[in-house]
């Protein structure tokens, strides 16, 4: 029986390691792997997509990047920076996002943030099968909410050696204390009953943040606007409930055993769109919330406030993001 078990395990590992990558939309330096997941509700077919930069030879340390809401992996420069520093680079497009979106999916739909744990596990399984022995998990925005919860849930057998959070979504950025203390719990409760209720309507015109980063408007960065909309989609009560419940869990404190680096802008900005303004601060989250809750997610947390950083810090202006990379790689020498 033991021999049969070993043979089965070896067969599974060989199958995973030999999985077929194919060319990625980002071009010659990237390739992608589609990983089938268990069917979703009502038999919905679900997949995860793992993207990797052309691998370095004989390197067994790697970064796994997890994107945010209304997002996917497109940050080629970030991948190149890690490669230059001797890190393999991988990114995951979560189910119902980006490369993992299928025509029958509702974009970004989720009822519990923990649904994304399967995407992360599948990515790490594949990375380990490819020989990765040291893995740094990196999450941005909603990915920066999912990844610490993942690390906490798996803390007794964590396969992650460090966690980097880029403007993590630790709390709702609402207009008043009443909205946060009364409105959020109410909408969250209603989300258990009226799941498709649109608590926030979408906008057909580009938002300020989208305009500030897209090369089709005032920004520097090319990305697929079908995968990352510059306008906003409606937010459902079910999605709001999933986020609210995740926030409550994180805000009570986590016990993540690995070193954590939390990065955020020095200021939150809002108001009518102005190019200079929107390129100088976080137009999505309240950075004070990030600073408030960061210290409570583990025992080894480093916080860095990034002057002039925008919401996705690695998309900030060159004079902001290049020194930021230096800080990240210096921290990774732990």
Model-derived segments and their meaning:
Residues 199-301, 305:
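Serine-hydrolase catalytic core
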Residues 69, 93-98, 169, 307-310:
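Short beta-to-alpha linker loops that shape the active-site pocket of alpha/beta-hydrolase fold enzymes
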Residues 20-57:
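N-terminal cap/lid segment of alpha/beta-hydrolase-fold proteins
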Residues 71-74, 79, 83-103:
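Conserved alpha/beta-hydrolase
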Residues 60-68:
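Short beta-strand element of the alpha/beta-hydrolase
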Residues 142, 146-235:
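Alpha/beta-hydrolase-fold enzymes
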Residues 300-334:
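Catalytic active-site module of serine/aspartate enzymes centered on a nucleophile-bearing elbow/loop
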């Amino acid at each position: 029986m033991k021999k049969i078990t070993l043979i089965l395990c070896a067969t599974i590992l060989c199958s995973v390691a030999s999985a077929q990558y194919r060319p990625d939309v980002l071009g010659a330096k990237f390739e992608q792997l589609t990983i089938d997941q268990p069917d979703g509700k009502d038999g919905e077919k679900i997949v995860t997509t793992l993207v990797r930069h052309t691998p370095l030879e004989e390197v067994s340390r790697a970064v796994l990047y997890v994107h945010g809401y209304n997002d996917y992996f497109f940050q080629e420069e970030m991948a190149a920076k890690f490669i230059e520093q001797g890190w393999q680079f991988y990114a995951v497009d979560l189910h119902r996002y980006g490369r993992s979106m299928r025509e029958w999916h509702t974009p970004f739909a989720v009822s519990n943030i923990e649904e994304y744990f399967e995407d992360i596990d599948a990515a790490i399984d594949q990375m380990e099968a490819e020989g990765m022995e040291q893995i740094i998990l990196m999450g941005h925005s909603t990915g920066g909410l999912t990844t610490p919860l993942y690390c906490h849930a798996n803390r007794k057998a964590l396969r992650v050696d460090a966690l980097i959070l880029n403007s993590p979504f630790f709390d709702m950025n609402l207009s008043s204390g009443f909205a946060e203390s009364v409105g959020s719990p109410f909408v969250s409760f209603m989300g258990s009953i009226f799941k498709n209720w649109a608590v926030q309507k979408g906008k057909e015109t580009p938002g300020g943040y989208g305009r500030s980063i897209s090369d089709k408007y005032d920004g520097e960065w090319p990305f697929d606007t079908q995968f990352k909309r510059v306008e906003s989609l409606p937010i459902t009560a079910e999605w709001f409930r999933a986020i609210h419940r995740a926030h409550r869990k994180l805000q009570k404190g986590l016990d993540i055993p690995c070193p954590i680096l939390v990065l955020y802008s020095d200021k939150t900005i809002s108001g009518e769109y102005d190019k200079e303004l929107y390129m100088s601060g976080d137009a999505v989250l309240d950075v004070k919330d990030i600073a408030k809750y960061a210290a409570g997610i583990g025992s080894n947390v480093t916080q860095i406030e990034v002057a002039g950083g925008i919401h996705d810090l690695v998309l900030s202006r060159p004079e902001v993001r290049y020194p930021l990379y230096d800080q990240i790689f210096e921290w990774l020498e732990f």
